[in-house]
Amino acid sequence: MSRIGNKVIVLPAGVEISNKDNVVTVKGPKGELTREFSKDIEIRVEGTEVTLHRPNDSKEMKTIHGTTRALLNNMVVGVSEGFKKELEMRGVGYRAQLQGKKLVLSVGKSHPDEVEAPEGITFELPNPTTIVVSGISKEVVGQTAAYVRSLRAPEPYKGKGIRYVGEFVRRKEGKTGK
């Protein structure tokens, strides 16, 4: 059984946390994140350590306890280090460009796809076929990267499309001739 909720969250240097009516605000060198948590879970801040306590050991409380701890830890990591997801484009003529805060993708359609960067998200292009999505919120970084990938998901026959770096795409064999 998982005991993630019982682990102590250690705050790195430069990270401050405040809790008011279970609305937690985490401030760090990269920015500030605020999130409301369940009233059932008690969040205690003691110096540079944060502990979470549940009122009883019911199944619902255990699940909320672990989830709350994971979300809070992601907030702490986000404001201190940040998160990033890398995507790569494979295909003839597939490339990306930046126009201000807008990502413009040429992925074999009759028109270019434009993706506006949500608040707190930055796009970087180390080369025209690699996209780096970075920010302080793990949730928003993941959703933005998934949206960019969904514009041209990798297809199983030639492997063309937008994929995460290191993602394995299952390939299929094409039709065989007579």
Swiss-Prot record:
Keywords: Ribonucleoprotein, Ribosomal protein, RNA-binding, rRNA-binding
Family annotation (NCBIfam families): L6_bact
Top-rank taxon: Bacteria
Quaternary structure note: Part of the 50S ribosomal subunit.
Keyword Ribosomal protein among record annotations: yes
GO MF, any single term: rRNA binding
Function: This protein binds to the 23S rRNA, and is important in its secondary structure. It is located near the subunit interface in the base of the L7/L12 stalk, and near the tRNA binding site of the peptidyltransferase center.
Gene Ontology process terms (BP): cytoplasmic translation
Protein name per the record: Large ribosomal subunit protein uL6
GO cellular-component term (any): cytosolic large ribosomal subunit
Record-stated family: Belongs to the universal ribosomal protein uL6 family.
